[in-house]
Amino acid sequence: MSRHICWICKLCRDESKRLPSNLTLDEVLKWAQSLESLMATKYGPIVYTAYLKLEHSDENIKFWMACETYKKIASRRGRISRAKKLYNIYIQPQSPREINIDSTTREAIIKSIREPTQTCFEEAQKIVYMHMEMDSYPRFLKSEMYQQLLKTVQSQSS
């Protein structure tokens, strides 16, 4: 991902007008339709994560993406291992990347951590998604990063 962030940072600092050749105006405009639309595109999650990283608030997107990966783990052993990692990084109080969830949701995860199901983080993931949708996503659309990227893509497509 660092390779992608590099072109994003250069663009935002106005040092580069080069974008990935397959980043289209259509894709960048889709990002403004909804967070769901942004997350369904190739570069949307990369750019959004870079923005959140600049804001020092990328724990929500990282947790959300980690949950998407977690849900695909079929083996019990793999699920237990990954669930413990997710707990230690994002759920445990005072953890380095602790996400903002209510105590009921946190307690439900703590109870299920020994025998985690594929859906044990689902409620926390929904809460985090709602936080992004209502808070950081609207800020992203107004950000200099998004506006500069949109302007550059528009100028290259005309």
Swiss-Prot record:
The keyword Disulfide bond does not apply. PROSITE patterns: RGS (PS50132). Residues 34-150 form the RGS domain. GO terms for biological process: G protein-coupled receptor signaling pathway; negative regulation of G protein-coupled receptor signaling pathway. Keywords: Signal transduction inhibitor. Pfam families: RGS. The keyword Repeat does not apply. GO terms for cellular component: cytosol; nucleus; plasma membrane. Inhibits signal transduction by increasing the GTPase activity of G protein alpha subunits thereby driving them into their inactive GDP-bound form. Binds to both G(i)-alpha and G(q)-alpha. This is Regulator of G-protein signaling 13. It comes from Mus musculus (Mouse). The lineage of its organism: Eukaryota, Metazoa, Chordata, Craniata, Vertebrata. The gene is Rgs13.
